[in-house]
Amino acid sequence: KELISAIQKAGGLKPMKMSLSLSEMASMIERVGKRGDAARGEKIYRRENLQCVACHAIGEVGGVIGPNMVSIGASAPLDYLIESLLEPSKKIKEGYHTNLVTLKNGDAHAGGIVSESKTELVIRDLTGKHNRIAKADVASKTISPVSLMPVGLTAQLREDEFVDLVRFMSELGKEGKYKTTTNRFARAWEVLPAGSPNPGTVHHYGAQMFTQEFSGYKWKPFYAMVGGGIPVDEVPVALKRRADEYQVLRTHVDVAKEGKHKVRLKGDSNRMDLFLDGEPIEIPADRTETDLELDCKKTGKRQLMLVLQGAKSSGQVSLEALSEDLTMLNSL
């Protein structure tokens, strides 16, 4: 702790305060505009311990517990963004208040009301689960003034990290690289977490092994960045065997018509394998961007799996549908 404190002091790095005076707010707004880095801020937004992605969607993908952030930067001033992060209960968007539903048997449910009819209400809890409750079983229903977003989430950030996070949020929805585009990227993926069990066939079948259903696999949601790219350094190494490392992602595409359809794959082609419903798609060597042809013999929902091999690296990969008869299914 003393070493960390010394490093922070030497670099002028301070932990983030949980409330700001008027003068501190003005200073923070100025810092966001002058020093904030949206690219760094997006990486901070995606940190698993902050739970931003788990609770908020940006466009099509992400959690549904909190408001969609797709245009927050274009619609909200900086002081609103800052205060909503530091004191979330002061800035609760309509429809996202915490509802407390107490049942006649003593059970209670807290969350957001998704829908309500004469006979039933549906409440979404903090995990995103929908709970259906018969109106006849309800003893009371109250709205809490407390936000679903926990207080203190940003306490784990340094001031400079907070500045970058706010800068990223302030760019969402504005013209530029942080406006969700109409490009047809695969944005909702699942990944195999680190330390996934090895069925023991990787040395025989290579990357294609991962296309087989295996009860030991526990897939986890994983979302692309606003621009559609997948940051390779965030994808866990599912399996390590001697010098080989495997990072495994899967997504789904809807095929409207049988036939050959094109997708665009970006990334180091020498370390990527792509499979359609378990069948390998040939990828030319030594490319960073290539258009591939999928021979779709069936319509409907089909699985695409991307396996990265070799030492874990930085950079991004992405997959984009080019044919009109392909639609990336960006909900898990």
What does each model-identified segment do?
Residues 3-34, 166, 170-237, 242, ...:
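Accessory carbohydrate-binding/adhesion or oligomerization-edge regions at the termini
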